[in-house]
Amino acid sequence: MNVFDEILQPTVVNKCLHGNFTSAEREEYVVARTNVLSVFRVSRAQKLVLAYEWKLAGKIIDMQLLPQIGSPLKMLAILSSKSKVSLVRFDPVAESLETLSLHYYHDKFVNLSTSSLKTESIMAVDPLFRCLLVFNEDVLAILPLKLNTEDMEIDEDENGIKEPMAKRLKRNQGITSDSIIMPISSLHKSLKHVYDIKWLNNFSKPTVGILYQPVLAWCGNEKVLGNTMRYMVLSLDVEDEKTTVIAELADLPNDLHTLVPLKRGYVLIGVNELLYISASGALQSCIRLNTFATSSINTRITDNSDMNIFLSKSSIYFYKALKRHDLLILIDENCRMYNIITESEGNLLTKFDCVQVPIVNEIFKNSRLPLSVCGDLNLETGRVLIGFLSGDAMFLQLKNLKVAFAAKRQLVETVDDDDDEYSALYGESQNNTHTRIVETQEPFDISLLDSIFNIGPLTSLTIGKVASVEPTIQRLPNPNKDEFSIVATSGVGRGSHLTALHSTVQPHIEQALKFTSATRIWNLKIKGKDKYLVTTDADKEKSDVYQIDRNFEPFRAQDFRKDSRTIGMETMDDDKRILQVTSGGLYLFDVDFKRLARLTIDIEIVHACIIDPYILFTDARGNIKIYQLDSKNKKKFIKFKLPEALNEIIITSGSIFKSNICNKFLHGLENSSQEQLLFTFVTGDNQVIFFTEKHNDRIFQLNGVDQLEDMLFISTYQIPEEMNPDPSIKQIMLNRLGHHKKEEFLTILTFGGEIYQYKKSTKHSGKLLKCKSHPLITGAPNNAYPQGVNKIERVAHYFPNYNGYSVVFITGQVPYIIIKEDNSVCRIFRMTNIPIVTMARWGKNSVMCVDNIKNARVMKLDPECYYGNTQILRKIIIEDVVEEFETLGNIAYHERTGMYIISYTKFIEYQALSEDGEPLVGYDPSKPNSTGYKSGLLLINPLTWNIIDRLDLSENSMVNDIKTMLIQLNSKTRRKRELVIIGSSFVKEEDQPSTGCLLVLDITEVVAEPGKPDSNFKFKQLFEEEIRGSVNAVCEISGRFMIGQSSKALVRDMQEDNSAVPVAFLDMPVFITDAKSFSNLMIIGDSMQGFTFVGFDAEPYRMIVLGKSTSKFQVMNLEFLVNNGNINFIVTDRQNHLHVLRYAPDEANSLSGQRLVHCNSFNMFTTNNYMKLVRKHVEFGSKTSNYIALGCQTDGSIFRMIPLNEASYRRFYLVQQQLLDHEIPLAGFNTKMERLDNEYYHKGHSLRPTLDSQVLKKYIHLPITKRTTIENRVGRHASTELWHDLIDIEFSLRSLTNSN
């Protein structure tokens, strides 16, 4: 009974496309990040701006753009993990995805395949869009598309060939025909072990090229079998289901892996060579890329082995057919770019060469493992988007591509002899010079336009202090005091770094003050500078003025109303006038606070909104009044005439905004984007109405806002016949939010503390669409969560410039900020870890916030953080001026000292030596050496993130695990000390037995080095031992520690002489991959045989097997999941499944607990690299010790597994079933299929699956009517209980902030 919740969305761009999917007028890029589909548009400033984003229920394996019938927009073919193809298009009315066609192939593939299917299929689209294929292992599905060649119009321009676009389609004709599913051998009997399959160009019928290997071979048996790779070209007759062999090539090198169809031929990419094949199927040329390339191939060979290039299967390519050239650029795993030059005359190849593109700047310094590339290029210029597994996705400008086609120039260079200085010394002639020929190439200009933030792959994580290291800032308590963050290691190679995940905003504190009394503050700017600070105390009915530029000296203003409660303050008339709105009236002053005008109001004013020259206020009786500053003498208030209908409406709040959302209803402004002043009000029945300055008694309304519908429309307001006041909307804001690119949003704050947002449609200015992307729960309706709004009133404040961002702040006991990055949707974050009572703008881009104990802080947004994901992300670079540490692996937090311990691994040249230190037999020094590893440990101080100590391990070593744990040092006194335990392995060649090392360290305080106050801690080595077998995992167990030593689990006890003595052991079947403990219990995972549940007893020392998993998981990571005394386990395997098992000795089929009960299995869309147990925050009920599990993954995402009690699980299960049954899934991605369908489904409890919070949180943003329908089906009091359950999930990690 658990729920899976993704707390950080994927960041790795695994697929990107260039084309018009949602707009024909703007250049667009369609980007997939695991299960998040985004559409970016290119702004005038050449930046990527997010237009739309959808979170699907399954992983996007591949996608291709197809022409759409009768439209300039493309439709999208999406391939999911279950060999399912979805054809979708953009729906301009709902501004969402519309599914046109769904095609399921997985079950047929399973029935037809003679071997196990791969986890991911291959999809390819015919260049003329006649059909589409899906291939997996040895089965193939062909989906005919009803877009014939006569229906295509192909425009050719000067630089390249555009994609065909569909013109018309016959009536009653669908977009697809019936799929053809067959074994690959049905195409030709010799087809086996297919490496790549692609559709080919310039054929009248659909034609495929297939790279396959009928007899598997590798370097070990290559001398016996020879080259067994083959290439075949087949023409397909889709209607008659016949094939014709056009060409076949045999005896190709065994390292070929990728086929690239060109306009006039094909290129086969191998690890060690490149082959060119003509359109007729003749092998015409080969390029040797390194000394390992084959020389026994019968064709013209170009020897480029001195380039020493290795093109692994992870290399990607970009191809575009230009008018006179084939533009083919390869990018290898180290992000080096190569241009493949092909020139031909007819079918005769005249030039085939590979040239490394000379990039001047180190633009790819921090990038590794490219995954996808797309863009629009010609010979002059172009833009491309490249997604990497490690490093930010880059939007690049490429200039002067002609350089890539230019041959290297040969220059004659004069070189002085090396012995010239000796000749001069002995008086000999110094004219000893000679010449040499040097090949040069012009540098290639490439510049970064924009990037998409990426922190993947995440390899390890820990919990530690980041922003709360300093207890006080500016003599006041740190607003993030006692707060812990998730710190993870990210990336591969030179771009590896630490990533800190913050659940709250951690701002820079520029200034701090202490007030004696203040419930609201205002900052009055005169001539653009902060001049006066006005405070008011609602309890004492008093107000004060301070001079900011005179160190906050009280200002003696005789006319200023100090004895009244101030409701609003603002400057008017270009900062020449100051307006004070008190509970009793309006007062107008000059800049020296000399009174110019006064307007007394009989009824108490409770709210005011001031936008020059208008003043809108509401009184205690709910009446609305608007006054205008006289435009002539600026010393008189003129009453603004309100529409007649307002006299019959109950108003709860009012504001003034600037917007153009109703321009199409205004005469003369139908096509204008000019913003108008809108006087906006919330009525007692939760309608939002507004009118303009020249309203002519005409009022507009937002239809559907009272029920929080998915789409709001603007129409003329009609007074209802019967009004039932039941106010739930407290305040609305209509503002532009964003960073460089501002977009208009409607923000709704309810009396229950909920925050809802609507975005103005880009297609229709009078329509607003609800924002549903990963909502944050901030409150609950129907007084279900009064704790969030009781102590301090929640009020929304808009700031147009907060460090360059336009944001909305919401004050309260738990304050929030609404912020938007240009390349992401709007996000809501908690603002610091303290309550905020009031706030005001400060300086040019800061705010002053006052907390509940009258402390005022001037806060500025941290520019080093990224606010576009569901958590605030901060990249922390660990570097040394002398040395690069490359990949950061494991991380641990030393709680006693507050330091971080990080392992690093960098590549070195591997020395193939035997155990005696002699070169191995068969070692060839003329060949390039393989790469080895060198690891070490870094001690990091989070105050400065500097390296204060390091410990280097020997060559060919790799750190596998680091843990900090309380270890018992004396069995009599039971004294414990926090130590660091490290397990490592020595990486050698396969003929040598594996060995490892156990290392025990302490961190001691020392005298800091001069000029380095942060270097006050050092490593102290206590114990080291080289061990036969690799040390893969370490964990604490009852004051001792266990090490996974290859297939043996060994418990060691620390002695007073710092020796680690083995006291108990247990043999595992194959190889220990991970081990975790809870009290005196332990689980040990095996690489092939599942895991074992073990108990440890210290008197006498022994390890007792309590239970084993019956399924033979290939365990990656595992963790305990303890809830109310029940012991559950979660396990992730190499097939990206997450399994939940339970120790249940009372169940009959468990054999008294010896067989662990398999509860359910859950599909994950990426590889899990690490899991950690964290204490759970309990918002409701008894404060028992419950735990949740955190896991980090390769695609940059982080999840949590949260255990539920029986009642909560039942409610959630009913809600999930209702949502899945009645809500149409986006792009046809069915949650049950994508998450639960796997080979272990029959072993679990089908009615007790792991729940998906992505589905459950849809309930939050359902319209009120649909929400009520679900609540009625769940049961009595379901509304309150469901919100309690959702809040309990949302706030489960508040244990990191020490919040109540």
Curated annotation (Swiss-Prot):
In which organism is this protein found? Kluyveromyces lactis (strain ATCC 8585 / CBS 2359 / DSM 70799 / NBRC 1267 / NRRL Y-1140 / WM37) (Yeast)
Domain of life of the native organism: Eukaryota
Q: What family does this belong to? A: Belongs to the CFT1 family.
* Subcellular location, principal: nucleus
Disulfide-bonded cysteine pairs: these are none
Q: Which GO terms describe its biological process?
A: mRNA processing
Q: What does this protein do?
A: RNA-binding component of the cleavage and polyadenylation factor (CPF) complex, which plays a key role in polyadenylation-dependent pre-mRNA 3'-end formation and cooperates with cleavage factors including the CFIA complex and NAB4/CFIB. Involved in poly(A) site recognition. May be involved in coupling transcription termination and mRNA 3'-end formation.
**Coiled-coil positions:** none
From the Swiss-Prot or TrEMBL record, state where the protein is found. Nucleus
Which Gene3D superfamilies does UniProt cross-reference here? YVTN repeat-like/Quinoprotein amine dehydrogenase
User: What is the name of the protein in this document?
Assistant: Protein CFT1
Q: Which UniProt keywords apply?
A: mRNA processing, Nucleus, RNA-binding
GO MF terms held by the record: RNA binding
Which GO CC annotations does the UniProt entry carry?
Answer: nucleus
